[in-house]
A protein has these predicted regions:
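Conserved Walker B catalytic segment
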Residues: 114-178, 185-186
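Amphipathic alpha-helical "lid/sensor" segments that cap RecA-like P-loop NTPase cores
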Residues: 217-251
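Conserved small helical "lid"/interfacial subdomain of P-loop NTPases
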Residues: 195-223, 229
């Protein structure tokens, strides 16, 4: 059996202590017939499990045919990237062609005869989102480790417009507290103040201890010492579990 723990940041490992409360809160809100929020911001210190939580939620919704899930790179032009990824979806691509939408100005497809090309990227996404709405689907966009960069600010401003248009777009972002704080302090992005923020606290001492004790079949005292070393950080839980597994024959 391969090591069930991982040293990779953000990758969901085989041995994983889930944050059931936060996961259910986001999933139930997004899946609601009339969602009270279409954005969640997950924050916490490095190693607190932000990316793993976001990935877990994204993977859950990927299994639902009524959802489209797209991950964006925060260091690139997010609007352009989102449009390109939506256009690359076979179901959506055919819908755009049937609706005679010409996105060739952005390198998306070819010119459509007797159709005026759309020349504004925000307008491109509005038209795409309208087609997603007509298909009965919802779109989840995930962005990991956001910073108050120009690309992020522009994307957040456009997202605010999409919300006012009642578009079926949802946003899940992770970031260090100071970056989230700086982003929401932008005068044009004050709506982010109202966006729910989940601050990931350390894992429960008893959850970590019990997990180690049961998985490694060790006594409570040994499991407790291991738990103390993790300080409740999910990544530390992974690292210690990984090392214990690799050296289990020595114990």
């Amino acid at each position: 059996m391969n090591n069930p723990f991982t040293l990779s940041f953000g990758k969901k490992p085989l041995q994983y202590i889930s944050r059931i409360s936060q996961t259910n809160q986001i999933l139930e809100t997004f899946r609601s017939a009339v969602p009270s929020n279409q954005i969640f911001m997950i924050t916490g210190v490095r190693g607190s499990g932000k990316t793993v939580l976001m990935t877990s939620i994204a993977n859950e919704l990927k299994q639902d045919d009524s959802w489209i899930v797209i991950e964006l790179n925060p260091t690139r032009d997010l609007l352009q990237s989102l449009a390109a990824k939506i256009y690359g979806l076979p179901d959506m691509h055919s819908r755009f062609l049937n609706a005679r939408l010409d996105f060739s100005a952005f390198g998306l497809g070819v010119s459509v005869e007797n159709a005026a090309p759309v020349t504004d990227i925000e307008n491109v996404l509005e038209l795409m989102l309208e087609q997603i709405k007509k298909s009965g689907k919802r779109l989840l966009v995930t962005v990991d480790e956001v910073t108050p960069s120009e690309y992020i600010r522009i994307f957040a401003s456009s997202f605010q417009i999409f919300l006012r248009q009642d578009q079926p777009i949802f946003l899940l972002m992770t970031g260090l507290y100071e970056n989230i704080y700086d982003l929401q302090n932008d005068r044009s992005l004050t709506f982010l103040y109202r966006a729910p923020k989940l601050l990931l606290e350390p894992l429960s001492y008893f959850s970590v201890r019990n997990h180690y004790q049961k998985f490694f079949d060790i006594d409570t005292k040994t499991a407790g010492k291991m738990t103390d070393l993790t300080k409740g950080y999910p990544f530390a839980f992974q690292v210690l579990g990984y090392l214990y597994w690799e050296n289990r024959r020595c114990h």
